[in-house]
Amino acid sequence: MVVKAAKNCQRCSLMFLDSEEDHHDSKNFAVAVTETGKGKFREVKIDDPAGHFKGRTIRVTGKVIVKDNQPQIEVDEPRQIEAV
């Protein structure tokens, strides 16, 4: 997927990489990087995953879940996201 929008959610402590500019778009697919995942990205010298992946095409591995009527994959490890 191409990351068209990327943002940190202050109230939920997740960082989102979205396939659409508007995260409410019914076509949006979200990659949610957990607080643990953000710490692990810092360990591999990626301090801002949102900025690092925005505009890039990525491949993500993990279990797809539906949260708030939107499909997403929660990421806990940097190896789950690959720039392609």
Feature roles, as predicted:
Residues 2-84:
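OB-fold single-stranded nucleic acid-binding module
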